[in-house]
UniProtKB/Swiss-Prot annotation:
Increases the activity of extracellular murein hydrolases possibly by mediating their export via hole formation. Inhibited by the antiholin-like proteins LrgAB. In an unstressed cell, the LrgAB products probably inhibit the function of the CidAB proteins. When a cell is stressed by the addition of antibiotics or by other factors in the environment, the CidAB proteins possibly oligomerize within the bacterial cell membrane, creating lesions that disrupt the proton motive force, which in turn results in loss of cell viability. Its main location: membrane. It comes from the Bacteria. The keyword Cell membrane applies. This is Holin-like protein CidB. GO terms for biological process: killing of cells of another organism. InterPro entries: CidB/LrgB. Keywords: Cell membrane, Cytolysis, Membrane, Transmembrane, Transmembrane helix. It is found in: Cell membrane.
């Protein structure tokens, strides 16, 4: 098959399956029917049935990645709209995100050390709550396995976006600041997309939570590894 045609088909496949998955979620309003999860499973099934390799899919997937990188800039819009509120609560925002990052590191690092996992495994799994673009770089720089890092980043994001609403309701969190920061800190881009579905203010705080988590983590992970190894 012509490479250009295959790329176009893979792009169309992704868009159509995501659109259908989103319609299914809208109809049944079930958090388990996450469109990213359903679309991913559907794409895998189609690729397996049609005998298309990952390399073949990425002929179109690469272009989607380029578009996604550009759409990150759009996250600046809700930040701009809520700049006064963000400035007002900046200390609380930074403290909350820093606490979340540290607790995540302590939990992951301690658990893996107790079970005797190697440095490479620890480095691979520590960036799981960072947005993929930064998490992959951190993992590669410190000797982790980036493909496994990506898997855990996606899994973490999906779990957070699926269970986030339920956990926030159970915890009684109704503030857009609390909801947004929780989504951004725990489940990066997936969580931010979910927060934007709630309201634009939650999306803004999720965006800043995601950004701060990436920045703080990219500084603290190398320091943590340096201290213990």
């Amino acid at each position: 098959m012509n490479e250009y045609l295959q790329a176009v088909l893979m792009i169309l496949l992704t868009i159509v399956l995501y659109y259908v998955s989103k319609k299914i979620q809208d109809k049944y309003n079930n958090p388990l029917l996450n469109p990213a999860l359903i679309a991913s499973i559907a794409i895998i099934i189609v690729l397996l049935v049609c005998g298309v390799s990952y390399k073949g899919y990425m002929k179109g997937g690469t272009w989607i990645n380029h578009v996604l990188n550009a759409t990150v800039v759009c996250l600046a819009y809700p930040l701009y709209q809520n700049k006064k509120k963000i400035k007002k609560y900046l200390t609380i925002i930074f403290t909350s995100v820093l606490t979340g990052v540290v607790l995540n590191f302590v939990l992951v690092f301690t658990t893996l050390k107790i079970f005797g996992y190697s440095k490479d495994t620890i480095v691979t799994l520590l960036p799981r709550s960072i947005t993929a673009a930064v998490g992959i770089e951190v993992s590669q720089e410190l000797g982790g396995t980036d493909t496994i890092t990506v898997l855990f980043i996606i899994t973490t994001g999906l779990i957070g976006s699926i269970l986030g609403s339920m956990l926030l309701r159970m915890g009684g969190f109704k503030s857009s600041i609390a909801r947004g920061l929780t989504y951004g800190n725990a489940s990066h881009a997936f969580g931010t997309a979910k927060a934007l579905e709630l309201d634009i203010e939650s999306g803004a705080f999720s965006s800043i939570g995601m950004i701060l988590t990436a920045v703080i983590s990219s500084v603290l992970i190398p320091v943590l590894i340096l201290l213990f190894y």
